[in-house]
């Protein structure tokens, strides 16, 4: 599907070799531009976001205008689609700039190289915040989006992220990932515990406090709970945690391994590896941990399941060929097909939410790197290389970003990159120690705990 709005960016963007903005004209009077988020050639779109204009209220609070603009700028930069202009090059004081189409001097912004401009204004009354945010097409001097919000001061960040999501929807046809979270394992306390953070690494919360090892967090499709592996009894057992209560409840404490949980895409059940029969096999469990079905039956070790988004297939790791490789199980036929043939050790598959690609970590030249392959085994591509061990990849819910752990700077920490392997950068987590085993949440509709 293509998403569009505005026409005359063609000349400018062709000169810049953008390819990210594609021009489409359905009718002469209603032409639009759109951002092709699937383009393999992506040039970041220059966008100007001056400090929000203070419109009055209870006292003067100009610093908040900068905070609001910075929050939006940082969120859009995280997406990898936008390049924010340095406020130092702006030609006017933001408090003297216009905020409406009639007041804005588009020629100045075009001179600075901006393709898009966001102008925001705000009012404060007690603990209430009023916001008006406008998105402009600088080239065509058009208002593209206007949103008005009335909220609490404490919800300022979430409101700005809501606008960022709306902006992405308007530009690309898809909501952004700005109301998502990540779960991961951290050892800041000296023990491996489960943590949550916002998509960009902010708002860190420790979820488990068992003074024992907790591993492999996995999000439920509705974002209301996570499953994980806990060692409270000294054995790897499966737990689920309702995020509203932050209480972990055991669902499988069978003898041996109870590991590698992953939720069925439509919820209500999950796949996991159990070894109570003596051999690690994949099983389908209901929400209470009761076995619905044994998915694999063989002498080998079968672990690390990852669902296709339609729930009809499952990627997993098996050593049935003598070395760990990625296989795909068709649940309808109950047949498994080997997916990977390159490399002697491939693990941690992650199926794209779009269904078209599978990530995994493979041992290459003595180090683990992230690879991507089509579900039919074609178009194998290496995404990381030459910088430490890169493992445990997972997808953002829109399939555009990849989160993974890397020890390229020493201890393992979390990194993010575009789906094509570009723009690799460390996630900003204000947390000591290592961070491993990330999992990205679905889009969330309520505030995080």
Task: Give the residues covered by each predicted segment.
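Amphipathic beta-strand/beta-sheet edge segments enriched in Tyr/Trp
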Residues: 33, 99-166
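Short loop/turn segments that connect beta-strands within beta-propeller blades
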Residues: 139, 198-202, 242-246, 286-290, ...
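A flexible loop/linker signature enriched in serine peptidases of the S9 family
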Residues: 175, 186-193, 209-212, 229-238, ...
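Residue-level detector of Asp-centered blade-edge/turn motifs that repeat once per structural unit
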Residues: 177-178, 221-222, 265-266, 309-310, ...
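Hydrophobic beta-strand positions that form the internal "hydrophobic ladder"
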Residues: 182, 226, 270-271, 311-315, ...
């Amino acid at each position: 599907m293509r998403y569009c709005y505005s026409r005359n960016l063609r000349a400018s963007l062709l000169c810049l070799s953008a390819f990210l903005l594609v021009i489409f004209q359905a009718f002469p009077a209603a032409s639009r531009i759109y951002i092709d988020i699937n383009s393999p050639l992506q040039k970041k779109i220059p966008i100007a976001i001056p400090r929000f204009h203070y419109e009055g209220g209870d006292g003067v609070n100009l610093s908040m205008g900068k905070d609001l603009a910075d929050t939006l700028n940082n969120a859009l930069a995280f997406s990898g689609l936008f390049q924010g202009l340095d406020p130092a090059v702006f030609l006017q004081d933001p408090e003297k700039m216009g905020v409406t189409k009639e007041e804005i001097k588009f020629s100045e912004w075009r001179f600075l190289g901006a393709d898009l401009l966001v102008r925001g204004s705000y009012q404060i009354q007690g603990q209430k915040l009023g916001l008006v945010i406008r998105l402009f097409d600088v080239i065509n001097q058009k208002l593209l989006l206007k949103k008005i919000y009335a909220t609490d001061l404490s919800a300022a960040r979430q409101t700005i992220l809501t606008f960022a999501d709306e902006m992405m929807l308007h530009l690309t046809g898809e909501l952004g990932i700005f109301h998502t979270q990540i779960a991961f394992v951290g050892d800041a306390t000296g023990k491996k515990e489960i943590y949550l953070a916002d998509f960009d690494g902010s708002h860190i919360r420790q979820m488990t406090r068992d003074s024992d090892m907790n591993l492999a967090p996995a999000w439920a499709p509705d974002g209301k709970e996570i499953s994980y592996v806990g060692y409270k009894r000294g054995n790897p057992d499966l737990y689920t945690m309702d995020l509203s209560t932050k209480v972990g409840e055991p669902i499988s404490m069978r003898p041996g391994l109870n590991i590698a949980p992953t939720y069925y895409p439509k919820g209500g059940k999950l796949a996991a590896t159990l070894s109570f029969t003596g051999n690690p096999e994949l099983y389908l469990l209901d929400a209470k941990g009761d076995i619905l079905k044994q998915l694999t039956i063989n002498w080998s070790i079968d672990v690390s399941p990852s669902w296709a988004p339609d729930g009809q297939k499952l990627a997993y790791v098996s050593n049935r060929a003598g070395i760990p490789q990625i296989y795909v199980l068709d649940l309808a036929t109950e047949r498994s097909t080997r997916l990977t043939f390159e490399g002697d050790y491939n693990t941690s598959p992650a199926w794209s939410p779009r269904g078209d690609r599978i990530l995994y970590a493979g041992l290459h030249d003595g180090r683990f790197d992230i690879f991507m392959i089509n579900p039919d085994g074609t178009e194998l591509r290496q995404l990381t290389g030459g910088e430490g061990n890169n493992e445990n990849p997972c997808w953002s819910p829109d399939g555009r970003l990849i989160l993974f752990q890397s020890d390229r700077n020493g201890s393992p920490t979390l990194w993010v990159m575009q789906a094509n392997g570009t723009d690799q950068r460390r996630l900003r987590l204000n947390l000591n120690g290592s961070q491993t085993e990330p999992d990205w949440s679905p889009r969330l509709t309520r505030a995080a705990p």
